[in-house]
Amino acid sequence: MYNELTKGDIEKMKEEIAERRSRTAALREEVRRTREFGDLSENDEYRSAKREFNKNNGRIRYLENMINTAKIIEVESTADAVGLFDFVTIYYPEDEETRVIRLVTTLRNDVLSDCISKDSPFGRAVLGAKVGDTVRVEVREGYSYPVTIQKIEKGQDDDSLPIAKY
């Protein structure tokens, strides 16, 4: 399966890879330096330095894999339908609540900031919907809930959305 990402996503990942690669030598040196502190079984500094070094290298591999397996998508939508990076005011009739979400790529998903992946059940339900449409969010087999699109404010792929950490 390929991750559908924008050119902006790819650029952000390349920037992070470059930044992390610039830190690799210093992290490697820290591992070497702390290794000299003595018995490795009781050397917390060494374990911490090694963990940071491995975390950095793991993130580089993860980002490179994401880039290598990405399918580049264009950010386009019609003026009256929900598209990628749009701000959408959603009404939940069952709870009588309103919420504003932003539809984003999987790499920029951040539920706590109301940035919802277009590939999530919620994202799939609202993508392409128009103001006034009531769509059903299929959470799992046998359970779904309705949401109504109240307002669409067109957004764009800007630098305000960081890529997600893992």
Language-model-derived ranges and their functions:
Residues 162-166:
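Short solvent-exposed strand/turn elements
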Residues 1-71:
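N-terminal intrinsically disordered, low-complexity, charge/repeat-rich segments that act as generic
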Residues 157-161:
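Short A/G/S/P-biased low-complexity tracts
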Residues 73-156:
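Non-DNA-binding regulatory cores of transcription-related proteins
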